[in-house]
Amino acid sequence: VFKPSKLLNYGELIEPPISFNTFTIEEISRPTAESALIDTSASIDSVTSLEALKGRWVLAYITQGDKCAEECKDNLYLTRQVRLMTGKNRFRVERMWITFQGNLSIPDSDRGEFDGLWTFKTDVNQTPFNAEPAYFAGVWIVDPLGRLIMKYPFGADPKKVYKDLSRLLKASRIG
């Protein structure tokens, strides 16, 4: 098998991808705007697994804590900006924030910055993260089949994340 000597992607490509569909999640809050899933499927009662988001690309921010300090806000802002940068393709992309601990709390003063954001909590022992939860903290791209395929470092360059995502959107026949 031929492997190119130079990779084009900025994020860490996960091989093999990690399935993200089968574990149980608990919905904390859902977007009121800027979500194609909400706009087209208002009949969804409660999301208890990522099966509901199947067929969508997802920019996911995964964290171990339930508070949103500056680093958290920066990463959530990154997911928002990257989604908006996709232009007409933004309705193919959802945003989510998942925590392993407690309920996520978004201060009322920050609500506008979090439009279009799904928030969930999950038990680390039921997820693919049970090996090393700290590794999974960060920004990820989840493909339309519900697999973690690319991870980004904290403080990632939004333009480079966008470039990776736009390549995936262009090449994808699903989602």
Task: Outline where the language-model segments fall.
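Short active-site neighborhood of thiol/selenol oxidoreductases, capturing the structured segment around
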Residues: 46-80
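N-terminal "domain-start" segment that seeds a small globular fold
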Residues: 1-51, 74
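Residue-level signal for short, function-critical loop segments
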Residues: 63-65, 101, 145
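Structural microenvironment flanking redox-active thiols in thiol-disulfide oxidoreductases
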Residues: 68-112
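Extracytoplasmic
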Residues: 54-56, 90-92, 134
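Short, internal strand/loop/helix patches
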Residues: 94-142
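Short, surface-exposed patches at the edges or C-terminal ends of soluble domains, predominantly
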Residues: 2, 80-85, 126, 163-175
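Thiol-/selenol-based redox modules, centered on thioredoxin-like
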Residues: 135, 141-175
